């Protein structure tokens, strides 16, 4: 009621001003608010912008790989020497850049991330018990941050059901002898419309360190290309959001409809002094390249899988492809069809690798490789990307595996105590019943160990989620109740040959055919 009275009073004043002959934009500038008026504070020194971050604070740090990381603010934290931080970030950069610098200086106590990746120091500190790591599916991480900024305390998601995320027991901290000192807690489970969902709690931070492209002097912000990623939801989820930009422009330089983050979310703003904008994986399409080839010329096994996987693409399909064989399969998409490639870091409409002069640090795929986009492409934030994925709007996801069970369980993210890469977006990608999940992999592991098994022995990525398995020997369809059916067999092999290298029984289709290959 008080707000309505204020509005009514203001309108009367404005009407009076207009009636008295005053010019509207000079004689009456009306501003209504039911909360305290707040302005974005501008800084010239990044250390000044972060010097009040205390020991033990929870800090949200934007970026995906090295794309869109707040370089200057991270360097400022190195100078302040703040300790015991809980850093919430999709990953931790590399050993000598990005958050990897704060790991090396032992300023981070706990990482909340989806992916360890190729940061050897991150993995070493975790496995040796020096660092606490809360591994969280990438889409769940993005949604937990989004929910925190929106005032939603918790939500249900299908991602992670039937895995250590739901069951608890995932190592957060190891003892020096390799035993588990701190383990994750189990999640509450509920069933909606016949599908299981787990309860995840929102994430908020004491501070958010965000990298954007430009800001105006009111504090409105825009991002560039795929550097939007986690930066956008993190802007909204902290008590104090500090944004660094490459350029500050005058008010009015942005059309209102082009603003990505309104000023209300931005508390502190600084123009970065310098940017290295390092590229983690520079992938170049050389001049004169002809037909696309597999990564290792002459590797018949991989090429055989790739050329079969390429037959899974259909005209008009939206697809998300994992690194390695799945992504290489996109090189063989028929020119007669259109496939829209989605990347979980916030791109729809991926194109081929760039020429040398086209490489752009702000345009990468989920494998952190430089890419291009096709006409009609779009960019969006990580939470938006996983709304597409979790919501079943992606028709096909193709990814690799360490193990697949007879009934479609998938394991591809960790070997306890030995190898931890993190689940990244994989748990989210296999969580929607509307999305076809195709696994591409070599039939056996080193030493001819089985990868297709009665039951997975490694921690699961998804439960009963795989629809099809493609190896160099065979193609299987997967039924969640009946198990495997052999539908294609590589020329020269027998069913018995495949059975000997498979760790479970399977049915044979009455329409069994030779393994198909897309034409070059």
Curated annotation (Swiss-Prot):
Family annotation (SUPFAM superfamilies): NagB/RpiA/CoA transferase-like
Keywords associated with the record: Disease variant, Lipid metabolism, Mitochondrion, Phosphoprotein, Transferase, Transit peptide
Impact reported for residue 437 to M: In SCOTD; uncertain significance
InterPro entries, alphabetized: 3-oxoacid_CoA-transf_A, 3-oxoacid_CoA-transf_B, 3-oxoacid_CoA-transferase, CoA_trans_fam_I, CoA_transf_AS, CoA_transf_BS, NagB/RpiA_transferase-like
Top-rank lineage group of the source organism: Eukaryota
Result, substituting residue 468 to C: In SCOTD; partial loss of activity; the mutant retains half of the activity of the wild-type at 30 degrees
Impact after mutating residue 327 to P: In SCOTD; partial loss of activity
Residues with PTM Phosphoserine: 170
Cellular component annotations (GO), alphabetically ordered: mitochondrial matrix; mitochondrion
Distribution of this protein across tissues and organs: Abundant in heart, followed in order by brain, kidney, skeletal muscle, and lung, whereas in liver it is undetectable. Expressed (at protein level) in all tissues (except in liver), most abundant in myocardium, then brain, kidney, adrenal glands, skeletal muscle and lung; also detectable in leukocytes and fibroblasts.
Family, as annotated: Belongs to the 3-oxoacid CoA-transferase family.
Effect of residue 280 to A: In SCOTD; uncertain significance
Single GO MF descriptor: succinyl-CoA:3-oxo-acid CoA-transferase activity
Name of protein: Succinyl-CoA:3-ketoacid coenzyme A transferase 1, mitochondrial
Subunit: Homodimer. Only one subunit is competent to transfer the CoA moiety to the acceptor carboxylate (3-oxo acid).
Enzyme type, top EC level: transferase
Organism: Homo sapiens
Function: Key enzyme for ketone body catabolism. Catalyzes the first, rate-limiting step of ketone body utilization in extrahepatic tissues, by transferring coenzyme A (CoA) from a donor thiolester species (succinyl-CoA) to an acceptor carboxylate (acetoacetate), and produces acetoacetyl-CoA. Acetoacetyl-CoA is further metabolized by acetoacetyl-CoA thiolase into two acetyl-CoA molecules which enter the citric acid cycle for energy production.
Effect listed in the UniProt record for changing residue 270 to K: In SCOTD; uncertain significance
């Amino acid at each position: 009621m008080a707000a309505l009275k204020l509005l009514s009073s203001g309108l009367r004043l404005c009407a009076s001003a207009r009636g008295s002959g005053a010019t509207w934009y000079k004689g009456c500038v009306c501003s209504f608010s039911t909360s305290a008026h707040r302005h974005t504070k501008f800084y010239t020194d990044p250390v000044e912008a972060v010097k009040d971050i205390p020991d033990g604070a929870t800090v949200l740090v934007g970026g995906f790989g090295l794309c869109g990381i707040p370089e200057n603010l991270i360097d400022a934290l190195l100078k302040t020497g703040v300790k015991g931080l809980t850093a919430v970030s999709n990953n931790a950069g590399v050993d000598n850049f990005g958050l990897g610098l704060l790991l090396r200086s032992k300023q981070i106590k706990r990482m909340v991330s989806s992916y360890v990746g190729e940061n050897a120091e991150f993995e070493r500190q975790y496995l040796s018990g020096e660092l606490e790591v809360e591994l969280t599916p990438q889409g769940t991480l993005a949604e937990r941050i989004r929910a925190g900024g929106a005032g939603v305390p918790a939500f249900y998601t299908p991602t992670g059901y039937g895995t250590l995320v739901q069951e608890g027991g995932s190592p957060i901290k190891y003892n020096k002898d390799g035993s588990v000192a701190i383990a994750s807690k189990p999640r509450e489970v509920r069933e909606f419309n016949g599908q299981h969902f787990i309860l995840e709690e929102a994430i908020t931070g004491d501070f958010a360190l965000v990298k954007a492209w430009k800001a105006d002097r009111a504090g409105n912000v825009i991002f560039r290309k795929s550097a939007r990623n986690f930066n956008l939801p993190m802007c909204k989820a902290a008590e104090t959001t500090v944004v660094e930009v490459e350029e500050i422009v005058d008010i009015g330089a942005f059309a209102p409809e082009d603003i990505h983050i309104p000023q209300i979310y931005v508390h502190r703003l600084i123009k970065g002094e310098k940017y290295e904008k390092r590229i983690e994986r520079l992938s170049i399409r050389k001049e004169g390249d002809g037909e696309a080839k597999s990564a290792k010329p002459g590797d018949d096994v991989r090429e055989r899988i790739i050329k079969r996987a390429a037959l899974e693409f259909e005209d008009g399909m939206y697809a998300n492809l994992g690194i390695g064989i799945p992504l290489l399969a996109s090189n063989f998409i028929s020119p007669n069809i259109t496939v829209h490639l989605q990347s979980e870091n916030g791109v729809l409409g991926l194109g081929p690798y760039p020429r040398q002069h086209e490489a752009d640090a702000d345009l990468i795929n989920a494998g952190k490789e430089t890419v291009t986009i096709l006409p009609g492409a779009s960019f969006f934030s990580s939470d938006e990307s996983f709304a597409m994925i979790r919501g079943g709007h992606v028709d096909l996801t193709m990814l690799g595996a360490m193990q697949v069970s007879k009934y479609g369980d998938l394991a591809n993210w960790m070997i306890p105590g030995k190898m931890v890469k993190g689940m990244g977006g994989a748990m989210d990608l296999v969580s929607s019943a509307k999305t076809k999940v195709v696994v591409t992999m070599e039939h056996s592991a080193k030493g001819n160990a089985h990868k297709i098994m009665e039951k997975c022995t490694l921690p699961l990525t998804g439960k009963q989620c795989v629809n099809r398995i493609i190896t160099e020997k065979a193609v299987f369809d997967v039924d969640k109740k009946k198990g495997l059916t052999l539908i294609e067999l590589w020329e020269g092999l027998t069913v018995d040959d495949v059975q000997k290298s498979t760790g479970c029984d399977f049915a044979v289709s009455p329409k069994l055919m030779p393994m198909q290959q897309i034409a070059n």
